[in-house]
Regions:
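Structural motif
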Residues: 58-60, 112-116, 140-145, 188, ...
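A short, conserved beta-to-alpha structural element at the edge of catalytic cores
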Residues: 139-160
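Conserved thiamine diphosphate
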Residues: 20, 111, 159-226
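Glycine-rich beta-alpha junction loops
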Residues: 64-66, 148-150, 206, 240-247
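Cofactor-binding active-site loop characterized by glycine-rich and histidine/acidic residues
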Residues: 2-142, 161-163
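Flexible, low-complexity linker and terminal segments
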Residues: 1-18, 22, 27-28, 225-234, ...
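Short acidic/glycine-rich loop or secondary-structure boundary segments that cap or lie
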Residues: 70, 152-154, 208-211, 245-249
Length: 277
């Protein structure tokens, strides 16, 4: 990159935006393990809420799992941020019930922007029934689903999304499809339901894919806002692949490589369903 381009980026404030913290995020370290991209997802979601000007009417429903403490990091009182900005609402849901809680909030306050933020154990295991029926009913919420192919918070047990032959504490010799079944592909499954209006799978492996993930989350939020205005219904799903260096016993770079080379074979990236024009 030449000096003129670097200067242009600096003049446009690109470096400051990349290094800055969105105003709705508290100025504190997160609990996420080193090398985990959960906090990157949290940051781009917060950036979008700020950029779209929807903080005062947004409610995020947090799960049980690695993101259980997400509510610690977002501001809730106007006094914690600029007086003209405000914070978002947060709700901590019982294990697997985030989409059910989000449904209740949305039905009681249909003009709010409601986001459920869940991992694969919460969304695709104990919460499978809630997830499927929320999408089948076409509840007007945006669901962010983190798929790291393992139970992260509880110590690395096999998840519904664990890959064939992938090792975990409960499959120390690797997952065998014959005895343990295969990975559940939530995007593919939920996109068959009439109530699902948008489903896309993205990854957090490099800058290009992170920007694609941000665009996908923005699309899901835009659809919800459009439905709020028009009275239409439909649920949006953004599935995000990311690594778990701690429980995979890998370094961050190796975990990103595993996502890019192995996980995407089992969980292809792309748009599986989008609104009809």
């Amino acid at each position: 990159m030449d000096q003129q381009t670097l200067k242009q980026l600096a003049d446009e404030g690109v470096y400051e935006r990349c290094a800055s913290r969105p105003k709705i995020l508290m100025n504190m370290p997160t609990h996420y393990c080193p090398g985990c991209n959960h906090d990157t997802v949290l940051k781009i979601m917060a950036e979008l809420i700020e950029e779209m000007g929807i903080a005062r009417r947004t409610t995020i429903v947090w799960p049980v799992g690695c993101s259980a403490f997400g509510s610690w990091y977002v501001t809730h009182k106007v006094g914690q941020v600029r007086e003209d900005f405000g914070g978002v609402d947060s709700v901590d849901a019982p294990h697997g019930r985030a989409t059910a809680v989000a449904t209740g909030i949305k039905r009681m306050q249909p003009n709010r922007v409601v986001i459920s933020f869940q991992g694969d154990g919460d969304f695709a295991a104990i919460g499978t029934a809630e997830s499927v029926h929320t999408f089948n009913r076409g509840e007007n919420i945006t669901s962010i689903f983190i798929n790291n192919a393992i139970y992260g918070m509880t110590g690395g047990q096999m998840a519904p999304t664990t890959l064939p032959q992938q090792k975990s504490t409960t499959s120390p010799y690797g997952r065998t499809v014959k005895d343990m079944g295969g990975p559940i592909r939530m995007c593919e499954m939920l996109s068959t339901l009439d109530g699902t209006v948008y489903a896309e799978r993205v990854a957090m492996t490099d800058a290009r894919h992170i920007l694609r993930a941000k665009r996908a989350i923005k699309r899901g939020l835009e659809i919800q806002l459009w439905h709020n205005e028009t009275g239409r219904r439909g649920t949006s799903l953004i599935e995000i692949l990311l690594g778990c260096p701690t429980n995979w016993k890998m370094g961050p770079a190796q975990a990103n490589q595993y996502v890019a080379e192995e996980m995407t074979r089992c969980f292809p990236l792309g748009v599986f369903k989008q609104p009809e024009k």
